[in-house]
């Protein structure tokens, strides 16, 4: 969902990009420019050659399973996707000298009560209240140790109107 909107923005601004998605929880029919997309998983063996051949210098990582209640029931699947595959992808980026890495994390790294939300601060220690938040927290630490230039965006719930598109 978020990755789609990032690509849509880049396409409309005519900025260069290339997207990767396994479409396990989205539809490829929404892709604006199918020539700039590859249907594969982030731990696929072809990612390394793709990254080196495209001369990529910045990566925006938006791939994750992202439903906190589901993460509590399916920890193995969330570990495999959000931690193991993501670490493999990050290591490929490091190996291919990616200069900038933008990781879309989550407000779920904070431990807060949704009924009593206080302002979250970046100086707070990560204390995830669910397994999804824990996977994001683990990768935040991993990213910080791998890239000289990295940005971590702790997004809160994102939703909005999209005309005639299904996700």
Q: Whereabouts are the PLM-identified features?
A:
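Conserved sequence/active-site signature of Rossmann-fold short-chain dehydrogenase/reductase
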Residues: 66, 109-110, 158-160
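Conserved catalytic-core motifs of eukaryotic protein kinase domains, centered on the activation segment
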Residues: 29-31, 69-77, 112-118, 164
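Glycine/proline-rich active-site loop of Rossmann-fold NAD(P)-dependent oxidoreductases
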Residues: 137, 159-167
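Short alpha-helix in the Rossmann-fold core of NAD(P)-dependent oxidoreductases
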Residues: 64, 79-86, 102-105, 135-136
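Active-site Tyr-X1-5-Lys
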Residues: 127-151
């Amino acid at each position: 969902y978020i990755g789609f909107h990032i690509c849509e923005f880049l396409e409309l601004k005519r900025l260069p990009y290339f997207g990767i998605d396994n479409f396990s929880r989205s539809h490829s029919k929404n892709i604006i420019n199918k020539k700039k997309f590859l249907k594969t998983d982030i731990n696929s063996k072809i990612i390394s050659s793709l990254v080196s051949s495209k001369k990529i210098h910045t990566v925006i990582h938006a791939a994750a399973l992202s439903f906190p209640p589901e993460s509590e029931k399916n920890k193995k699947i969330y570990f495999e996707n959000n931690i193991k595959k993501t670490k493999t992808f990050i290591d490929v980026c490091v190996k291919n000298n990616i200069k900038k890495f933008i990781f879309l994390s989550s407000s779920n790294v904070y431990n807060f009560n949704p009924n009593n939300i206080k302002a979250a601060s970046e100086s707070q220690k990560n204390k995830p209240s669910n397994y999804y938040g824990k996977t994001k927290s683990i990768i935040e630490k991993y990213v910080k140790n791998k890239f000289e230039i990295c940005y971590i965006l702790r997004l809160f719930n994102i939703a909005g109107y999209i005309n005639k598109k299904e996700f």
